[in-house]
Amino acid sequence: GSGALVGAFLFVIGGTISFKSTPAAAKRGGTIILTKVAISIILGLIVGKLLNDNFLGLSALAIIGAMSGANNAMYAGIVHDFGDEVDEGAVGITILSVGPYVTMIALASSGLASFSIVTLLATILPLLVGMILANLFPAVKKILTDGMNASIVVVGFALGCSMNFSQIFIGGASGILLGVVVTLVGGAFTIWTDKLTGGSGVAGAAISSTAG
């Protein structure tokens, strides 16, 4: 049922986005997502082409898959408390990092996989519907905005139920190293580009995670 919950989450997120803040939000969201993708591709190519697809137990596929994705529920929660309106509006762009869409684009760019546009459209549609309805009807916008925190909790709980603590031990040192690379290396670049384009760095830090 996580797929349906994520769809509802997208609908709610769309309802919090104002058409007026869309250009600035799209710029901020696009900046940090493109940074994640670019860094993941560069590191993936280095590992895949120069290090024989093995960097301390990490493959190019693992690095690209982890670095190009993000936990958007975590992003939404962090920017809701510490970010500004533009950071929150950028959720409409960063939501693309939740599923395999951005990751598949990154893998396709590095020649490791192909990409289907159908899965991308499936994500954008509920987001657009929520955005349009909320901007046309103020009452709908208020309902969806008030439900933002609840939707983050529900989606986070559902995704958490699909995880297993044993995966931490199975991943071992390589898994820990991958987490460090995603958070510290990837985060350093997303925070830098966020500040470089007029942000506070909160959005860049909030996106420095990987999708569960």
Model-derived segments and their meaning:
Residues 34, 47, 51-98, 197-212:
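Alpha-helical membrane segments and immediately flanking helix-loop junctions
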Residues 1-28, 127-137, 146-171:
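Hydrophobic transmembrane alpha-helices of secondary-active transporters
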Residues 5, 9, 31-45, 93-105, ...:
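Small-residue-rich segments of transmembrane alpha-helices in multi-pass membrane proteins
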Residues 46-59, 105-118, 162-175:
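Helix-coil boundary and interhelical linker segments in multi-pass alpha-helical membrane proteins
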Residues 45-53, 137-148:
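Membrane interface segments of multi-pass transport proteins and intramembrane proteases
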Residues 1-5, 17-49, 163-194:
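Entry/N-cap segments of selected transmembrane alpha helices
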Residues 1-9, 55-69, 114-128, 173-185:
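Structural signature of hydrophobic alpha-helical transmembrane segments
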Residues 90-136:
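Loop-centered beta-sheet repeat module
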